[in-house]
A protein has these predicted regions:
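Cytosolic regulatory regions built on CNB/CRP/Popeye-like sensor folds
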Residues: 1-135
Length: 135
């Protein structure tokens, strides 16, 4: 099942970008794997990505296609949990990385950013539920 991911508020992205480092994705790459320890989130500045959730059997249960303005790995970063999906970006995508530590310090220093983070997480939950209801 495929779905399109919600996009983050441009103000939130702007603040996160100020703390981020560029990630080379010239040939496309896997950013993180389902079950891997979370070390931060990724900002998809341009290009395309897919986030895939697999069952223990290896069967793909859910797939989200993302575009510019998406934050990949946000639920794991906020929850301090392993990544719940695998994220891959296509060749030529522009991606930036924010460490979990830097994200936590930012939200502590600027708590007014939290409503935007929560809205994005809620949109991801709604999107996943809608996709699951279509099966």
């Amino acid at each position: 099942m495929k779905n399109k991911s919600p996009v983050a508020d441009p103000k939130l992205i702007e603040v996160l970008e100020s703390l981020s480092l560029p990630i080379y994705c010239g040939q496309g790459r896997k950013l993180f794997m389902q079950g891997e320890a979370c070390n931060g989130l990724y900002i998809l500045e341009s290009g395309e990505a897919a986030q895939v959730l697999n069952a223990a059997s290896g069967r793909t249960v859910y797939c989200i296609h993302t575009g510019s303005g998406s934050l990949l790995g946000l639920p794991a970063t906020v929850g301090n949990e392993p990544y719940s999906m695998t994220a891959m970006v296509k060749k030529g995508s522009k991606v930036r990385f924010v460490t979990r530590y830097d994200f936590e310090k930012l939200v502590e220093a600027e708590p007014q950013l939290y409503p935007g983070v929560m809205q994005l997480l809620a949109a991801e939950v709604r999107s996943a539920r809608l996709a699951l209801s279509e099966t």
